């Protein structure tokens, strides 16, 4: 579908109700979501573009999506991309929103097998307030749900050949975000070793933790341990820019970096 507008709507379900996504644009173009309140038990917004068999046949991305002035509460992810994204997600902006009591703020779910057209590009999050979000930013390239999610091919951290099954995460921008009362981790970025996350740019971001922070996993993939008040974890990222990024109150190192090719700190 093209040219969709959702304005001033309330979407409400019990916070413990499974499979209750609020709004899932799939292979849609020119979507505006303005002033919508979400309070539910799953992802508030989940942007998708089909599994690989659909992507090969239709190859239709979700593109030009603008989310602003929304309130998102109690879901797994405030704004989720994937995991069905064989057509890709291009030009998505989230701004001037409030996320409260969600498991994650941004939640990217992808993995090997989604296909070479499963490209995420020009993803922008700015001017956001997050409170009691367990982990504000998650990019997980080893998402393990669905029947094939726990296969060796999907979960292995070894370098595999880049082929027509390999997804790609390109540039993401995060600006002017205040994250208070976080619980699990400041951010969790886990890219594929053979196709690293191309670029993460972060500017003017503050992250602090709840005194009684809960312990849980920041991302749904094999080998990820539960944590509480963890700093930022970034693995397999080609370029990471941290411009006035402040993490306060973490337990352990503020930054855990592995396989980051270029780090710029200002």
Question: What does each model-found stretch correspond to?
Answer:
Residues 1-266:
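Extracellular/periplasmic carbohydrate-active domains that bind, remodel
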């Amino acid at each position: 579908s093209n040219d969709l507008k959702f304005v001033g709507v309330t979407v409400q379900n019990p916070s413990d109700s499974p499979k209750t996504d609020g709004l899932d644009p799939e292979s849609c173009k020119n979507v505006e979501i303005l002033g919508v309140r979400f309070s539910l038990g799953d992802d508030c917004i989940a942007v998708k573009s089909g599994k690989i068999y659909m992507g090969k046949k239709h190859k239709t991305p979700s593109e030009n999506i603008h989310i602003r002035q929304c309130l998102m509460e109690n879901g797994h992810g405030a704004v989720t991309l994937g995991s069905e994204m064989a057509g890709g997600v291009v030009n998505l902006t989230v701004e001037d929103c409030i996320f409260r009591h969600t498991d994650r703020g941004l939640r990217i779910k992808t993995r090997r097998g989604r296909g070479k057209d499963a490209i995420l590009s020009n993803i922008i999050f700015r001017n956001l307030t997050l409170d009691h979000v367990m982990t504000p930013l998650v990019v997980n390239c080893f998402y393990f749900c669905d029947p094939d999610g726990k296969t060796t091919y999907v979960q292995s951290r070894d370098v595999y050949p880049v082929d027509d099954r390999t997804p790609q995460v390109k540039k993401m921008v995060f600006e002017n975000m205040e994250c208070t009362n976080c619980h699990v981790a400041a951010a969790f970025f886990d890219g594929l070793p053979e196709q690293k996350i191309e670029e993460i740019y972060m500017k003017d971001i503050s992250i602090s933790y709840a005194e009684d922070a809960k312990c849980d996993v920041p991302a749904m993939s094999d080998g990820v341990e539960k944590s509480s008040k963890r700093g930022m974890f970034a693995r397999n990222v080609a370029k990471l820019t941290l411009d006035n990024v402040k993490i306060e109150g973490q337990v352990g190192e503020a930054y855990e970096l592995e396989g980051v090719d270029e780090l710029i700190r200002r």
